[in-house]
Amino acid sequence: MSHLTVYRDDDPDDIVLRTDDAAVIADALRGIGARFERWDSPVVPPLDATPDAVLNTYRPYLDELMGETGAGSADVVRINAATPNLTALRDKFLSEHTHSEDEVRFFVHGSGNFVLHVDGRVYDVCCTAGDLISVPRGTPHWFDAGLSPDVVALRVFTDTTGWIADYTGDDIARRFPVS
């Protein structure tokens, strides 16, 4: 189940908010410029569906989202035990970074935590299948799919060159294990 835990950024033991209510999650993230939604698709593609099948399943949602955001492309990413260089990839995601465009993800299968560092707070959002999250450009954050990930997600891009991170150099992600 999706949930949000908010901490003060100087104390990982000081929980400011913890909720699994999607409306409360959306409101809390909206307050920092992020977006969170639940998409209820009548059909969920199988875990081993081809990227095209996954994209086609969610095409109506993607068309609307891409029209709203001006995004130019979408693709499917799978992160699991068979992912080449999984450890190095996880290390990249776990380092606090920003992007020059919004980072938009929709979880088709599995789960992962997007952790946003904004205005003295750490917002740990556990996203599960059916969740859409959009992290605003320039927002320091990191991502953790866990030690044994099994995630399928849609990625939506404005810049067709794909995922490019600008690392902050802050080690805060090491101090805040995901909830």
Curated annotation (Swiss-Prot):
Pfam families: ARD. It catalyses: 1,2-dihydroxy-5-(methylsulfanyl)pent-1-en-3-one + O2 = 3-(methylsulfanyl)propanoate + CO + formate + 2 H(+); 1,2-dihydroxy-5-(methylsulfanyl)pent-1-en-3-one + O2 = 4-methylsulfanyl-2-oxobutanoate + formate + 2 H(+). Keywords: Amino-acid biosynthesis, Dioxygenase, Iron, Metal-binding, Methionine biosynthesis, Nickel, Oxidoreductase. The record marks R105 as: Important to generate the dianion. The record marks E96 as: May play a role in metal incorporation in vivo. GO terms for biological process: L-methionine salvage from methylthioadenosine; L-methionine salvage from S-adenosylmethionine. Binds 1 Fe(2+) cation per monomer. Transmembrane segments: none annotated. Fe(2+) binds at H97, H99, E103, H141. The record marks D102 as: May play a role in transmitting local conformational changes. Its EC number is 1.13.11.54, 1.13.11.53. Its cofactor is Fe(2+); Ni(2+). InterPro entries: ARD, ARD_bac, RmlC-like_jellyroll, RmlC_Cupin_sf. Pathway: Amino-acid biosynthesis; L-methionine biosynthesis via salvage pathway; L-methionine from S-methyl-5-thio-alpha-D-ribose 1-phosphate: step 5/6. Ni(2+) binds at H97, H99, E103, H141. Monomer. Catalyzes 2 different reactions between oxygen and the acireductone 1,2-dihydroxy-3-keto-5-methylthiopentene (DHK-MTPene) depending upon the metal bound in the active site. Fe-containing acireductone dioxygenase (Fe-ARD) produces formate and 2-keto-4-methylthiobutyrate (KMTB), the alpha-ketoacid precursor of methionine in the methionine recycle pathway. Ni-containing acireductone dioxygenase (Ni-ARD) produces methylthiopropionate, carbon monoxide and formate, and does not lie on the methionine recycle pathway. This is Acireductone dioxygenase.
